[in-house]
Amino acid sequence: MTQRLFTSESVTEGHPDKICDAISDSILDAMLAVDPDSHVAVETVVTTGQVHVVGEVRCRGYVEIPSLVRQTLRNIGFLSSDMGFDGATCGVSVSIGEQSLEIGAGVDTALEARDGAEVEDDDRAGAGDQGLMFGYATNETPEYMPLPIALAHRLARRLTAVRKDDIVPHLRPDGKTQVTLAYNDDNNPIRIDTIVISTQHDPGVSRQWLEEQLRTNVITPVIKDAGVENLVDDELTVLINPSGSFVVGGPMGDAGLTGRKIIVDTYGGMARHGGGAFSGKDPSKVDRSAAYAMRWVAKNIVAAGLADRCEVQVAYAIGRANPVGLYVETFGTEKEPISAIQEAVQKVFDLRPAAIIRELDLKRPIYAQTAAYGHFGRTDLDLPWERLDRVDDLKAAISR
C-alpha cells in the first residue's frame, strides 16, 4: 500500500509572529468593545526590546494602546528581560492614522447603492477590499479539520498549558510543533509518522530531560485526548528541539510581524489560501469575515453528508456588496452533483459582507482568543463560524 506523507505545523502564543497577532487582535477587540462599528487595520512589529504598532482605524471611542500591548505581553508570559523580553519595560511606539475616506466610503455605501437603484439594507455595505477567500472542511476529525493541523494545534496548546501551569518547569513562551501523517490512496490517515516539538527553555536544561518531560506531559496526553492511539506505532519518530539548545527566543530571537502565519491560522496547507491574513482586521475586511463564512459553508456541507471533503472559494470587488465569484470543490467525494451543492449554498447562505457580519454576529470583541492555535476547528472555543446551524437547510435545498 502506498503511503503519502503530509505535514502541518503550529506555533505557540510566544512565537514572535503570534505575539504580533495577539497584540493586533487585542487592539481590535478593545475598539469593537467601545464602538462596534469600528473600522480597524492594525499591524504590529516586535523585535528585541521594542513593539511598534501601526495602521489605520476609525473608532468613536478611546483605547489606551500601550497599556493593552503590555498586558498582552504579560499574559503570554514575557515577564522578565532575563528571558529576552519584558512586557513591563519594553519600548512601545504607536503610529495609527485615520482610515482612508475613500475606502470608508466604499464600505459604507456599496456600488449597488451608489447606482441609485432601490436596494436592500445588506446591499448598502460594500466589501472592504477585493480578494479571494477559501474555506475547507473534512470528515476525518470530529472538528471537521485535517488531522495534521488539528494535532499540531493540540500539541501547541498543551505545550503552553504545561508551561503556564508549571507542570513542566523551565519552559519559556516561544515554541513550535509539527506533525507528519501517512495517508493511504483513499486519502485516509493511517499512522502518525513524525512529531516535532521545539520549545524555548531556561539555560542549563538537558535535551534528554526535556524530551522525557514532553513525551510524558505533552505528546501522550494529546494523542489520548484526540483519540488517535490507533495511529501510533513503533516507527513513530519524535524529535524534541532537534537543533539543540533553544534559550534565546521570542522577539529577541526573531523579529515578528502580524499576519505571517496564515497557513497555521487556517488548514495547515491542506487547503488553498487566498493570501489575506486575519489578525488586526475588523469584519468589514472580507479577508477575515468571508474566510470565516467560507469555513461555515464548507463545514455545514460536510456535516450535511453532501461531501466528505469540501473547499469553497468566494471573491469580492472592493465597494461591491455581492460576491463576484463562488466555487465549490469536493475532490470527488460529493454525494450529490457539485452543481446542486453550489446551488444549495447560494440558496442557504447570504454572502454579502453585511449579511455575513449580521448572521455570524461579528461586531463583537471575540478575536484575541483566535490569535493563536488556529481560527478553525477550535474545540476549546464557541466560535459562530463553527456552528452547524445550516445542515438541515442544505439538505432541504438539495432535496427540492
Swiss-Prot record:
Record: residues binding ATP: H15, D174, G175, K176, D254, R260, K261, A277, K281
The protein's annotated pathway: Amino-acid biosynthesis; S-adenosyl-L-methionine biosynthesis; S-adenosyl-L-methionine from L-methionine: step 1/1
Pfam families, per database record: S-AdoMet_synt_C, S-AdoMet_synt_M, S-AdoMet_synt_N
Cofactor(s) this protein cannot do without: Mg(2+); K(+)
Residues binding L-methionine: E56, Q99, D254, K285
EC class name: transferase
Subcellular location: Cytoplasm
EC number: 2.5.1.6
Chain spans, region Flexible loop: 99-109
UniProt catalytic activity: L-methionine + ATP + H2O = S-adenosyl-L-methionine + phosphate + diphosphate
Quaternary structure annotation from Swiss-Prot or TrEMBL: Homotetramer; dimer of dimers.
Protein name: S-adenosylmethionine synthase
Cofactor comment text: Binds 2 divalent ions per subunit. Binds 1 potassium ion per subunit.
Molecular function, one GO term: methionine adenosyltransferase activity
Swiss-Prot/TrEMBL GO biological process terms: one-carbon metabolic process; S-adenosylmethionine biosynthetic process
Homology family: Belongs to the AdoMet synthase family.
GO cellular component, one term: cytoplasm
Keywords tagged on the record: ATP-binding, Cytoplasm, Magnesium, Metal-binding, Nucleotide-binding, One-carbon metabolism, Potassium, Transferase
Residues that, per the record, bind Mg(2+): D17
Superkingdom of this protein's organism: Bacteria
Purpose: Catalyzes the formation of S-adenosylmethionine (AdoMet) from methionine and ATP. The overall synthetic reaction is composed of two sequential steps, AdoMet formation and the subsequent tripolyphosphate hydrolysis which occurs prior to release of AdoMet from the enzyme.
CDD domains for the chain: S-AdoMet_synt
Record-listed K(+) binding positions: E43
